Amino acid sequence: WRGEEGGIAAAKSGHDAIMSPTSHCYFDYGLDATDLKEVYHYEPIPAELTEEESKHILGGECNMWSERAPQELVDSKVFPRILAMSEVLWSSSEKDYDNFYSRVQKHYPKLDALGVNYGFESVPITSTVVFNNDSFYVSLFKGSPDMRLEYNLNNGTWQDYTTPFGAHSTTTLKARGFKNAKPYGEFEQELIRHIATGKKVNYIIPYNSHYQGTGDYNLTDGLLGSIENFRDGYYQGFSGTDMEVIIDLGQNTTFSNIETTFFQYYLSWI
């Protein structure tokens, strides 16, 4: 469990082991951590083992800790990722994800017939946002190649997404996906414009390399982190140090208050 070190040590000492690292095998984790492609590329026999030692790796195990997911979400977390784990454990180490992906699509009609409430193969919709020349520039990305995306700004008209677009002021971006003519994921993001948006941040104390967020402009990029998931890529962290920064507004500027947000989660030492 957790990592591969215990299994490697067991095999090297002549004991049998079943591998189940968190990096690929914990299905209670979200798709942002472990999606279908990540599971498919898992190799249960560590490269550090000799041919003789590798005989002690009996297989792998995937985990679904239901206390981390309401009962109604269990199906969507297990399927379709369990198809990838099955493929990994009964196939050779050679990988062809495109071929596997095409075969996964053939399983969905049967899962529908069985009443399985399966989930997504990867995070359905993601974005990159860059603030430049006094505007936000937004690119949307679909998690599956056979998806179609629509978006709207500030609850306006839905339109097909084909190319990146701009937004000049504080904006609520919504997007939705479709696959095989069925809804396939929703996305919402606030683009927040203020006097510090896009301004340079000078870090007197550097942020931790494990919690980089979006980089040197994380604090002024106009994007807020999720209130539910500190792993969403928008949080920047400092470990064992204070936080001290200088934000250069570029000119003398009058302001009346400063707002910031923090994430607290004791179970992850945050």
Locate each region found by the language model.
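Disordered, acidic Ser/Thr/Pro-rich linker "stalks" and the adjacent N-terminal cap
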Residues: 187-255, 263-269
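Solvent-exposed segments in extracellular or luminal domains encompassing
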Residues: 163-172
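Short, exposed coil/turn segments at beta-strand boundaries within extracellular/luminal domains
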Residues: 180-187
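Substrate-binding groove of N-acetylhexosamine-processing glycoside hydrolases
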Residues: 1-149, 155, 190-208
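Short beta-strand/loop motifs in extracellular/secreted proteins, especially
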Residues: 145-149, 243, 256
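Short beta-strand segments within Ig-like beta-sandwich modules, predominantly Fibronectin type-III
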Residues: 155-162
